[in-house]
C-alpha cells in the first residue's frame, strides 16, 4: 500500500530511516548508504559494509544509539545543493551510491532547477526530498523496533552489488506496534509456505526449478474444486470454454505488444522450425483474440465470452519468488469478453456482481478496489491519449454506479487499458492484488478484430479481460492463510476422517468409507495402532473439517457421532442423514469452516 507523503506516519517512518542511518554510521563510518524509504509497516535502509557486513546481533546496539539520537531532539532542516556541491559533499565520505543517484536525478530532469534536496539532523546529512518530523524527539517512546536484516541488490539489479538492508517496524505508538507484532505472529502460523508443506499441498524442488510449484494430491484437489466452481458460474453466465497452446511464435507477441512492452517478464525464446522463435506465453489474451478471429462475427454473436483456465509462464527474479504467491508458472482463471460499445457497462457490471458473489461466498471482507490508470509521461502504455481518458472515465463511472468506494492509482494500468484491481489484506495488513478486470481498447485494432454491426458496417469490439479467482497459485496461497488451512468441506482434500474407537467396529468404519466413496465424498479411515486420542489429534492437526467417531453404540444403531473442526457440539446422527448432510454441504458449497454454519440436518 502506498503511504501518503503528507501523512504523520510517513514523516515518522522516513525520519526513523534517517535516524537509523545516523546510528549505523556511528559504529561503521565507512559504510556506504543506498536508499532508506518509509514502507508499509515501517522503514528500511540499505548499506554496503564491504567485506565485513553487520549481523542481526548488531541490531540491539544500533537501536540503543537510535534512542539516544531521539532523546537529543535533533531538528530536521532542509537545504538544496547543485550537483557539483552534492558530489563534493558526498565524496567526503565516499558515498558512491548517492553520487550515482544524484547524477541520475539531474540528468533525467527530476531535480527541480538542477537542485538536489538534503536534510540535516545533528551531525548527519542525507540527500532526500523529505518530508520529516520537526525534530527527532517527536518519535513516540516504544513506537519502533529494528526488525531484521536481508540482502538487496543495488537498484534491484542482480548484476549490481548486494547491499545489506536493515528493516525496522514503526507505528504511531507502542500499542500499535505491539498489536502489529501479535498479528504478525498469528500470520506466521498461517503462512501458506508453512501450512502448504505441513498439509501436503505443494512442494518446490530445486531440480525442477525456482518458482515452479509441484501440486501434490491435496493441492490438486483444491485446484479442481475451485475450477469446477468457476466453470459452473461461467457456464451460467454464458461463457464458452476454450483450450489454447502454451507456446507461440514471436510474431503473435509483437502483434499484441507483449514484445517489447512485456518482454522483461517473459522467458527467453526457443529456436525451432528453421530458426523461428517461440515463447512460453505470459498471458492468454492473444490466443483468445485468435479464437475470436477464427471466423466472421456478427453483432448477434456479441457479447462473445471466452473462458479458460490457462497455464502462463512469467520470468520473476529469483529474489522476488515466494511460495505460491510469486511464481514462474501459474494457471489463471481467465476470460475475455468481446462486446459492442453500448454493452461495455452492462458486461462490466455483471463482472462486478460475479466478483461480489465469489467474495461474499468465501467470506472475504477486508479488501479495497483500485482504479489503475495510465501515466501519460510513461512510454510503457500504448494507444491514443484521448482513448485512454475515455476508457478510464468509463470504468470510473461504472464503479461509481455500482456504489463502490475506490482509490485511483496512476501508472498501474495494463499497457493496453485501465483496470479495476481488488487488493486483499492479510492478517498483518499486507495487500496483494488477488483479482483484476481490465477494459481494453487497443487489442481489437492490433489484431484487426471486427464484427458486422446492425447496419452492415465492420466495427471493432471492445474487449474486457477478467480473472476473479486470479491464478490457482495466488488464490490458493491466500485461501490457505485466510482459513489457516481449515478449508470448508466442499473444498477440503479429506472431507471426513472416520475414526473407530477399536478393532471391534473397524468393519463398520470401512463400510462407511465405501459408502462415502460411492457418493464421491473424500474420506479416510484411521484404524491405525495409535490410541484413540492420538488419532483424533492427528485429524485435528491435519485440519480435517469432519470427524466421524464410531463406537459400539454407533455400529449397533448404524449411526455416527459427528465432530467438526473447532466446534464443540458432537451430535450423533443416523448414517443416512449424515451422508445426506454431507452431500448438501458439498452441493451448496457451504462455508462450514465457520462456526456459525450448522450441519444441514
Locations of regions flagged by a protein language model:
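Auxiliary tRNA-acceptor-end handling modules of aminoacyl-tRNA synthetases
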Residues: 1-11, 23, 28, 32-38, ...
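A glycine-rich phosphate-binding loop feature that marks nucleotide/adenosyl-phosphate handling sites
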Residues: 37-43, 81-90, 201-207, 244-255, ...
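Conserved, charged catalytic cores of large soluble enzymes
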Residues: 47-49, 57, 363-394, 492-511, ...
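Metal-assisted phosphate- and nucleotidyl-transfer catalytic regions
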Residues: 72-120, 266, 362-437
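A translation/RNA-centric and nucleic-acid-associated enzymatic feature enriched
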Residues: 275-277, 286-287, 291-295, 304, ...
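Extended, charged alpha-beta segments that form solvent-exposed binding/catalytic grooves
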Residues: 312-398
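Generic long, charged, amphipathic alpha-helical segments
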Residues: 484-535
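C-terminal structured "cap/appendage" subdomains that terminate the fold
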Residues: 516-578, 582
Amino acid at each position: 500500500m502506498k503511504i501518503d507523503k503528507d501523512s504523520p506516519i510517513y514523516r515518522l517512518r522516513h525520519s526513523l530511516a534517517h535516524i537509523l542511518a545516523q546510528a549505523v554510521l556511528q559504529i561503521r563510518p565507512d559504510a556506504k548508504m543506498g536508499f532508506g524509504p518509509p514502507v508499509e509497516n515501517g522503514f528500511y535502509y540499505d548499506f554496503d559494509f564491504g567485506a565485513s557486513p553487520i549481523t542481526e546481533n548488531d541490531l540491539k546496539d544500533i537501536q540503543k544509539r537510535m534512542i539516544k539520537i531521539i532523546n537529543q531532539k535533533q531538528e530536521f532542516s532542509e537545504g538544496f545543493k547543485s550537483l557539483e556541491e552534492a558530489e563534493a559533499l558526498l565524496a567526503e565520505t565516499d558515498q558512491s551510491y548517492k553520487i550515482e543517484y544524484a547524477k541520475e536525478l539531474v540528468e533525467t530532469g527530476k531535480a527541480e532547477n538542477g537542485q538536489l534536496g538534503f536534510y540535516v539532523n545533528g551531525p548527519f546529512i542525507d540527500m532526500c526530498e523529505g518530508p520529516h518530523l520537526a525534530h527527532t524527539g517527536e518519535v513516540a517512546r516504544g513506537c519502533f523496533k529494528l526488525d531484521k536484516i536481508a540482502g538487496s541488490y543495488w537498484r534491484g539489479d542482480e548484476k549490481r552489488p548486494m547491499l545489506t538492508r536493515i528493516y525496522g517496524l514503526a507505528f504511531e505508538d507502542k500499542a500499535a506496534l505491539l498489536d502489529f507484532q501479535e498479528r504478525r505472529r498469528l500470520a506466521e502460523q498461517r503462512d501458506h509456505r508453512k501450512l502448504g508443506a505441513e498439509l501436503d499441498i505443494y512442494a518446490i524442488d530445486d531440480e525442477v526449478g525456482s518458482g515452479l510449484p509441484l501440486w501434490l494430491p491435496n493441492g490438486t484437489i483444491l485446484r479442481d474444486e475451485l475450477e469446477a466452481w468457476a466453470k459452473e458460474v461461467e457456464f451460467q453466465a454464458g461463457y464458452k470454454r476454450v483450450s489454447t497452446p502454451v507456446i507461440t511464435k514471436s510474431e503473435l507477441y509483437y502483434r499484441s505488444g507483449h514484445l517489447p512492452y512485456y518482454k522483461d517478464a517473459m522467458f527467453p525464446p526457443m529456436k525451432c522450425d528453421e530458426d523461428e522463435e517461440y515463447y512460453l506465453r505470459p498471458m492468454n489474451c492473444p490466443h483468445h483474440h485468435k479464437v475470436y478471429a477464427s471466423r466472421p462475427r456478427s453483432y448477434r454473436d456479441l457479447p462473445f465470452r471466452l473462458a479458460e483456465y490457462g497455464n502462463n509462464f512469467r520470468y520473476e527474479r529469483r529474489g522476488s519468488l515466494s511460495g505460491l504467491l510469486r511464481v514462474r508458472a501459474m494457471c489463471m482463471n481467465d476470460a475475455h469478453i468481446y462486446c459492442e460499445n453500448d454493452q461495455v457497462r452492462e458486461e462490466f457490471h455483471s463482472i462486478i456482481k460475479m466478483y461480489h458473489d465469489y467474495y461474499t461466498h468465501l467470506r472475504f471482507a477486508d479488501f479495497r478496489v483500485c482504479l489503475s490508470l495510465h501515466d501519460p509521461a510513461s512510454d510503457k502504455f500504448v494507444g491514443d491519449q484521448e482513448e485512454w481518458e475515455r476508457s478510464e472515465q468509463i470504468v470510473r463511472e461504472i464503479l461509481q454506479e455500482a456504489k463502490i468506494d475506490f482509490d485511483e492509482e496512476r501508472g498501474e494500468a495494463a499497457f493496453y487499458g485501465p483496470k479495476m484491481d481488488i487488493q486483499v489484506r492479510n492478517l498483518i495488513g499486507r495487500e496483494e492484488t488477488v483479482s483484476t478486470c481490465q477494459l481494453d481498447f487497443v487489442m481489437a485494432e492490433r489484431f484487426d478484430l471486427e464484427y458486422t454491426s446492425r447496419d452492415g458496417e465492420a466495427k471493432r469490439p471492445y474487449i474486457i479481460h477478467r480473472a476473479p479467482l486470479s491464478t490457482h497459485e495466488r488464490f490458493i496461497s491466500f485461501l490457505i492463510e485466510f482459513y489457516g488451512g481449515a478449508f470448508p468441506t466442499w473444498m477440503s482434500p479429506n472431507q471426513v476422517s472416520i475414526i473407530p474407537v477399536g478393532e471391534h467396529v473397524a468393519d463398520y468404519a470401512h463400510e462407511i468409507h465405501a459408502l462415502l466413496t460411492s457418493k464421491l465424498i473424500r474420506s479416510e479411515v484411521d484404524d491405525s495402532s495409535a490410541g484413540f486420542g492420538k488419532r483424533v489429534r492427528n485429524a485435528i492437526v491435519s485440519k480435517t473439517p469432519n470427524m466421524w467417531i464410531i463406537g459400539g453404540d454407533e455400529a449397533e444403531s448404524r449411526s455416527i457421532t459427528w465432530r467438526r473442526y473447532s466446534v464443540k457440539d458432537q451430535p450423533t446422527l443416523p448414517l443416512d442423514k449424515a451422508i445426506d448432510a454431507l452431500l448438501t454441504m458439498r452441493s451448496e458449497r457451504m462455508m462450514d469452516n465457520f462456526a456459525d454454519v450448522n450441519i444441514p440436518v
